[in-house]
Design a protein with these regions (language model features):
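Beta-rich carbohydrate-recognition and catalytic domains
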Residues: 1-125, 133-223
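Acyl-donor binding region in acyl/amide transferases
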Residues: 128
Length: 223
């Protein structure tokens, strides 16, 4: 295929092993968790599963980070060359004392089950695996996984600056589907200039999602 021709695909990826990994956990980064009101080293365990978008000639990477107990929060890093990234010191998106806490906070914590180092995954929870697109109005739409220790549920949030986010709740709100295991929502986009922008197809936004299986969902307003 002619590499100059129009295509839906992004060809010619090349690993740059000389600088990989481009992000590592920084064990000294801390912030005050709004639920426990305690100091947390929010990415001391892992950094993984990022999403990226270009704004003003800068690559902004939203990435999942885990603390010692496996609570996931979303951090933000930026780069002017797409290879070397600088992190913000605190997460931009995290479980909070809000209506989404029931889906983002491990049920064991609510039941008072004591922490144990013998179970490294018992307390996994939080906000995971961001996917981001720009809307036609210029705002940013992020799908993410809310995890309460039992069920992964796709959720959605929006932002005008990639730092301050508004949560809009579960994507699959219907009682029939809201407790189904769902994650990894990828909204269909179209290239507009140098941006990938969410686009309606025959009047509807479309989203692929799923991990072990692939499904589709539709929306009239991206929310």
């Amino acid at each position: 295929e002619d590499p100059q021709s129009e295509s839906w695909a992004f060809p010619f990826f090349q690993k740059v092993d000389s600088i990989n990994p481009i992000l590592n956990p920084t064990q000294s980064l801390s912030f005050t968790d709004p639920i426990t009101n305690s100091k947390v080293f929010w990415e001391e365990r892992n950094v993984l599963n990022p999403a990226a978008i270009v704004k003003n000639d800068t690559v902004f990477m939203l990435y999942r980070a885990q603390d010692q107990w496996g609570t996931s929060r979303i951090g933000l890093a930026y780069s002017t060359d797409g290879l070397h990234f600088e992190k913000r010191a605190t997460p931009v998106f995290f479980p909070d004392q809000d209506p989404q806490k029931t889906f983002e906070w491990n049920y064991r914590k609510e039941e008072g089950v004591p922490y144990s180092l013998d179970c490294k995954s018992c307390y996994f929870d939080g906000v995971e695996d961001p996917r981001i697109v720009q809307s036609e109005t210029g705002s940013y739409i992020m799908t993410y996984t809310a995890y309460d220790g039992k069920t992964a549920r796709m959720s959605i949030a929006s932002s005008k600056d990639l730092i301050h986010w508004e949560k809009h709740g579960l994507i699959l709100k219907d009682d029939k589907y809201k407790d189904y295991w769902s994650k990894s929502g990828s909204i269909v986009t179209q290239r507009m200039g140098n941006q990938q922008v969410a686009v309606k197809i025959k009047g509807t936004y479309w989203m692929y999602f799923g991990d072990t299986n692939l499904f589709m969902a539709t929306s009239e307003d991206l929310i």
